[in-house]
Each structure stands twice: as C-alpha cells, then as structure tokens.
Amino acid sequence: MKFSMPSWGVVFYALLVCLLPFLSKAGVQADDVDSYGTVIGIDLGTTYSCVGVMKGGRVEILANDQGSRITPSYVAFTEDERLVGDAAKNQAANNPFNTIFDIKRLIGLKYKDESVQRDIKHFPYKVKNKDGKPVVVVETKGEKKTYTPEEISAMILTKMKDIAQDYLGKKVTHAVVTVPAYFNDAQRQATKDAGIIAGLNVLRIVNEPTAAAIAYGLDHTDDEKQIVVYDLGGGTFDVSLLSIESGVFEVLATAGDTHLGGEDFDYRVIKHFVKQYNKKHDVDITKNAKTIGKLKREVEKAKRTLSSQMSTRIEIESFFDGEDFSETLTRAKFEELNIDLFKRTLKPVEQVLKDSGVKKEDVHDIVLVGGSTRIPKVQELLEKFFDGKKASKGINPDEAVAYGAAVQAGVLSGEDGVEDIVLLDVNPLTLGIETTGGVMTKLINRNTNIPTKKSQIFSTAVDNQSTVLIQVFEGERTMSKDNNLLGKFELKGIPPAPRGVPQIEVTFELDANGILRVTAHDKGTGKSETITITNDKGRLSKDEIERMVEEAERFAEEDALIRETIEAKNSLENYAHSLRNQVADKSGLGGKISADDKEALNDAVTETLEWLEANSVSATKEDFEEKKEALSAIAYPITSKIYEGGEGGDESNDGGFYADDDEAPFHDEL
C-alpha cells in the first residue's frame, strides 16, 4: 500500500497547536476549571500508590493517615470491615484469602490471558472467570462476594482521594491517573472506569514514565535534552525516551514489559527459600497461604535492606507447624536469583533507542523511577549499558510519577506556574485497517505523538459495491491476520458505481488517553459510521504487544516481500481496469482509436483479468510485473497512434489514458 506520511516536523507542529488548548492554562475554559475544583494526580501502582496536588505553583506529595507518602495497593475484607492501604497489608499474613493485592495485573485483561493464568497460581485469594473476565472472590460478613479488578482499583483510588480531601479540607471530584506506557486500550479504559466507581472524573490518563519526565524536567527546561526514563516498579517496567525543551515534553519512543517488577524479584527469593525449607524439613509449605504470606512480607523487607547492606537475616516466628524460620540472604544470592530478570530490562532500553534513532551517547540523562531502581545491580547494569554514565538521582523514585501527575493536574485546572508545559505522548502500536489482499494499511504509526488524527481516502473493490467493511487492527505486521483485530463496522448505502469511483474517507482519532475513534464517511452521499474502541473490544495483552514487535522484526523481510507482491498485483489489476474503462469511454480514448485496436485492447485486458483470477494466489511479484509489461506493450503502440496521427501533437494524454509510467491514481480498496 502506498501512502505518504507528513514529516515529523509538521506532525510536531500540528500536535503542538492541537495540544495547547488542552494543556495550557489559557486553553481551559473558565467554567470547566471552576467545576473541576482542585485536580489531583494519582500514581495507581501495582504495589504502592501515591497522590499529589499542585497549589500555588508547588507540588505536594501527600502523606496518608500513617504518615507515609506511599500507600500499599492492598484491599482486605474481614468479618467486620473493609481495609485499604497499610491496614490491609499489615494483616495480610493472617487473612491471606481475603486480602487483595497486585490487582493492576488483572485490570482490563481477560481471564484466559496467559499472564492472568500465570498470576492466579500465585495469588492466595481466589480469582474466577465471569463473562470472560477475572473477578476476585472474598468472604466477608458471613457471605461470599465477587469484585471486579475495576472495583478493587476504585477502592484504592478512593483511599487516595480521601488522603487528598483530608489535606485540602474540601471535596475532590477530578483527577489525573497514571498507567504503564504499554497499557493497552482495554487497560486504560478499565482504569478510567475504576475512577468513575471511585467518584472521580479522570480527566487524563498519563503514561508513568512521561509523568516522571515532567517531574524531572521542570528544573531542566532551558536547553533541549534527550532523557531516558527507566521505570521499574513493583509489577511493571517501562522505558521511554523523551525530548525536553522549553516546557515541551515530547515522547520519542516507548517500550516495556507490563509484567516485570519488584514482585517478580521477590517471587524468585520466595521460591528459593520454599525449596530450601521443604528439603530441610521434609515438608511442603507451598499450599499454606498463611506461611507463604509471612515469607512474602519478610522477603520484601529483606530486598529493601539489601539495597544498602550486603546481607540480612530473615527471622519468622511460628513459621510453619510451630517451627521458626531463620535464614540469611546476601546481596550476592539475591542478584544470582534475579540476574536474568535484571538483564531483561535492558532490551526495552535498546528498543527505544532503536525506534527513536538516538544513539546512547546522545542521551543526556537517565532518570530512575520506581522503588526497584534502588537495587544496586540494576543501577550497575544500566550504568554499564550507557558506557559509565550515571543515572540522575535528583527525584524520589517512589514519588516521581505522582509528582508529574500532579503537575499535569495543575495544568488542567489552570494552576499558576505551569502555563508553559506541553505534553506530547505517543501510542505504543501501529493502527490501521484491512484493505484488498488482506494487507493492513497503516493510518497511525507506532510511536506517533498523541492526541492525533489521520484520514485517508479508500474506495470499493468491485463494481456496484453498496457496503464496505471497515476492520480496525493494531500491530506491526504487514498482513492484518497477523495483527490484533480491535473492532469492525459496515458503511452501507453506497450508490452503485464502478469499482474505484466511490470515495470513502476513513478517519482515525486517537485521544490523549490513547483511546481510538474510527469514522468512515462516504463523500458522495455524506453518510458516515463511527466506532469507538473500548475495553470490550478485545485489545491486546502485554505479552501480545511484545510478541508483535519481535515478530515484526523477525519477519520483516518476509513481510516486505508479501507487501511488494500485493502491490504488484493491485497495480496490474488497476491498470487493466483503468484501460478497459477508458476504451469504453467514447468521448475519450474509445472514440479516437479504430475498431480493430479497440478489439485488441479489450482482448488483452480480458486475457489479463482472466489470468489474474486464475493465478492471483500463486503468482510472484515478478509474474505480476511481467504481465503488466506485456499489457503495456500492447496498449502503448495503439495510444501512440493518437498523437502521431494529428491530434494536435498534444502530449497531455488527452482522453485520460495513463501510460505505463503515468499510472492512473487509485485509492486502496476496501
């Protein structure tokens, strides 16, 4: 499929103009700002959450009722009450089946997703399938209840809202919430739904590394800088490469693994000690949720200690069957158990550099975000990758994301001091539709700044086609069948016309939250249909996103050949149809050639189309090109006679016939 993309400079300028009304103080309507009140910024994390607010040009990260500025993303149900945060986590070991954590690993996903199935094996609480989606089952007040991941997340968001309301002394109704950069549309939609359940209007979903870059960039806005944000949290990992200059934050590329973080490191240690304990005592503690819960709590503490010490002792009284647990964990052993996971974090770093075309020596700063970046080995590997360049430690890795979210919240609510900030985020996967031959025609490329809008004209594939099917895909492969179907709809009522004549304008609108709206508009009749891709349309899981990018690289040569073959086929088919139509045009070419020449051309076109029908699947790119040359060899001498025969010597191809090197323009067919 041939289509042109605007230069990045034009895209950047257009997006800057597009974004300013949303992000500058002047662009927010006064009435809207008044109705917003104070907008808060929330980092809804896998293991911990954090909330901030901007007042008077300064960001405050708010402490909870325990005096801590980070709150565990835990929800627990007892016989009498529901607990959220520290209170829930503190009783987890004694109430493992009714204490919910890591809910971010389930939100927006399907029950049958591989990652969900892998995770629920390790959760002490029960997860069951309800209408294809995972729900948690708890027992409270003498009865069993089920909750969706959105509901559990809403309980955590409500806790963060309450912290802000206690600080502000007034009601809070609007928020900016962060998500991992590689969260897909379903996960983003589910996060917004959680906000609604919590009584919050989520004005903007912001990618976590982008939010962290805002926190970093406020003090570094003079000269242009390329920075890598390395965000390794409790359950997810993101890397983004950004350009910051004069308050403009442009995301150049993003990559990551939404299933890699501190909890995975903990699990390796837990697995090691469980195996050791079972062998030593000839028991099996794997099925005892309370025992594993106690070990999980202490292993997390030990991991934190090892960031500043070379070894630590783990002591647990009445660990199992009255026996105590006492083992030493060294930093060296912790690193040995997790070294492959640590090294795995470097692959997305390589990916963003490759995608953006930036060399690692041109990176000005590396910003560390997330508690897991405190692990010395992680810092060492990253420093080695960047040839000795040390990471910036000017911001608190636990609070940076909430800080950036609070700044963005301040922008949206018209706070002083943030008028000049412009945020240019990107979409993680290419978006397009299926066209003739099963090819995915791209409309919005991967790593395009959002919000963005892209339109392209398509046409019908057969004569008198009254309906076109618009199938929307995301992914990096040439053929749509190898990508992920997001949704489909039909545009009906197209008036009868030869193939290629109707003009169907397809428009993709991707908003600042990464949510997609697709419209098909028949320019002839004015009819249009629209679909918004929401969380029930089956967006991708994180593993599928990584697989698509890897497969796209692995099969790049194969994909290129397939695309070239289909283009050659389409070129031949359109050339033949264009020739037939113009021979039939009595006011044009058809009225200027002899009956014998007309018959010769029609016979050649008919033979070509019959050959196409018989060989379209098996023929190679070269076959299609040779067939087109053969048809052109018959057509060219006939059309040349027009100009040699006294038609005024006009070389403007009067009559509308297009020679081989001046092919009739045509739109991709639906």
Swiss-Prot record:
The keyword Kinase does not apply. The lineage of its organism: Eukaryota, Fungi, Dikarya, Ascomycota, Saccharomycotina. GO terms for molecular function: ATP binding; ATP hydrolysis activity; ATP-dependent protein folding chaperone; heat shock protein binding; protein folding chaperone. Residues 407-507 are annotated as: Substrate-binding (SBD). A motif (Prevents secretion from ER) lies at residues 667-670. This is Endoplasmic reticulum chaperone BiP. GO terms for biological process: chaperone cofactor-dependent protein refolding; endoplasmic reticulum unfolded protein response; ERAD pathway; IRE1-mediated unfolded protein response; protein refolding; response to unfolded protein. GO terms for cellular component: cortical endoplasmic reticulum lumen; cytoplasm; endoplasmic reticulum chaperone complex; endoplasmic reticulum lumen; membrane; nuclear membrane; nucleus; perinuclear endoplasmic reticulum lumen. Its EC number is 3.6.4.10. Probably plays a role in facilitating the assembly of multimeric protein complexes inside the ER. Is required for secretory polypeptide translocation. May physically associate with SEC63 protein in the endoplasmic reticulum and this interaction may be regulated by ATP hydrolysis. Its main location: endoplasmic reticulum. Residues 133-287 are annotated as: Nucleotide-binding (NBD). It catalyses: ATP + H2O = ADP + phosphate + H(+). SUPFAM superfamilies: Actin-like ATPase domain, Heat shock protein 70kD (HSP70), C-terminal subdomain, Heat shock protein 70kD (HSP70), peptide-binding domain. Residues 1-26 form the signal peptide. Glycans are attached at N464. ATP binds at residues 45-48, 104, 234-236, 300-307, 371-374.
